[in-house]
């Protein structure tokens, strides 16, 4: 997958870049596996803004993705590699030997005609899904379950993967994309390989309107608002806000730890590293 830069025929296209989509083999989705989604643009049931910076966007169909990969022992053939507007990674339409079609997350390198399989007896091969205790240490995996049978929840975005670092009793240690090391039950399923569309983060949006197509509205700083709208607002002329940075609801931000403890924290072996460049 490569990135194509547009010629600067207009000011808005000067830094504009798009994916070339050479891996995509089908444009129209498989209709039985699509659904209509009700987009609320960040509004609640009374029409009030519940999530800021969300607005109208292009229409899209929801693709029903199989995150569980629970058809054990039945081989499937990859029919198409498709674009999904609801996620950054590409998806693949697979047809099982019993005739059932399903969408799965497409790993990088998966091609039309490839055979994939799920289950403890599956081969260690790109696109196959196995329990973590059946996968060798050092293997790149994605779409990893946190709870047995719930479906993949970890490493589902474009180009992401986790690495199996160690096995200890009933648990397997995973190094996650955030550099966090976490223990997961050995019965949880994971898919071999890293996800497709790894150049997704290199795309330059290029113009404001393109973000509006995605449903993203502008982000306004608190110090330029009125006092009624934000704790940092108001003042005569340009001000610093007059206090430590806070959210619109008065909660400290920029360095203040807001992460709550939860029972699953005991499975974290090593916390994620801080991003010094942020």
UniProtKB/Swiss-Prot annotation:
Keyword Acyltransferase found: no
UniProt-annotated stretches for the region Disordered: 224-262
Keyword terms of this UniProt record: Ribonucleoprotein, Ribosomal protein, RNA-binding, rRNA-binding
GO-annotated molecular function: rRNA binding; structural constituent of ribosome; transferase activity
GO cellular component: large ribosomal subunit
Cited PROSITE patterns: RIBOSOMAL_L2
SUPFAM superfamilies: Nucleic acid-binding proteins (SSF50249), Translation proteins SH3-like domain (SSF50104)
GO biological process: cytoplasmic translation
One family name in Pfam for this protein: Ribosomal_L2
Function noted in UniProt: One of the primary rRNA binding proteins. Required for association of the 30S and 50S subunits to form the 70S ribosome, for tRNA binding and peptide bond formation. It has been suggested to have peptidyltransferase activity; this is somewhat controversial. Makes several contacts with the 16S rRNA in the 70S ribosome.
Subunit architecture: Part of the 50S ribosomal subunit. Forms a bridge to the 30S subunit in the 70S ribosome.
The name this protein goes by in its record: Large ribosomal subunit protein uL2
Organism phylogeny: Bacteria, Pseudomonadati, Spirochaetota, Spirochaetia, Leptospirales
Gene: rplB
């Amino acid at each position: 997958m490569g990135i194509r830069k547009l010629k600067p025929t207009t000011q808005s296209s000067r830094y504009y870049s798009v994916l070339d989509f050479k891996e995509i083999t089908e444009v129209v989705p498989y209709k039985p596996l699509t659904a209509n989604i009700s987009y609320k643009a960040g509004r609640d049931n009374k029409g009030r803004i519940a999530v800021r910076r969300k607005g109208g966007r292009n229409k899209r169909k929801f693709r029903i993705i199989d995150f569980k990969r629970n058809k054990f022992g039945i081989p499937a053939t990859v029919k198409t590699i498709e674009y999904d507007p609801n996620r950054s990674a590409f998806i693949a339409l697979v047809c099982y030997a019993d005739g059932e079609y399903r969408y799965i997350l497409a790993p990088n390198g998966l091609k039309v005609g490839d055979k994939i399989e799920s289950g403890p007896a599956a081969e260690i091969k790109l696109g196959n899904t196995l329990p973590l205790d059946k996968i060798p240490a050092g293997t790149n995996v994605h779409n990893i379950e946190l709870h047995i049978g719930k479906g993949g929840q970890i490493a589902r975005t474009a180009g992401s993967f986790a690495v199996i670092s160690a096995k200890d009793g009933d648990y397997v240690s995973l190094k996650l994309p955030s550099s966090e090391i976490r223990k997961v039950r050995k019965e949880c399923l994971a898919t071999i390989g890293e996800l497709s569309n790894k150049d997704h983060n290199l795309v330059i949006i290029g113009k404001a309107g393109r973000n509006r197509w995605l449903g993203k509205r502008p982000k306004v700083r608190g110090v330029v608002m009125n006092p009624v709208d934000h704790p940092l607002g108001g003042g005569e002329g340009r001000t610093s806000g007059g206090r430590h940075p806070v959210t619109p609801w008065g909660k400290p931000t920029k360095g203040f730890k807001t992460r709550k403890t939860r029972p699953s924290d005991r499975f974290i072996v090593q916390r994620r590293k801080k991003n010094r460049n942020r």
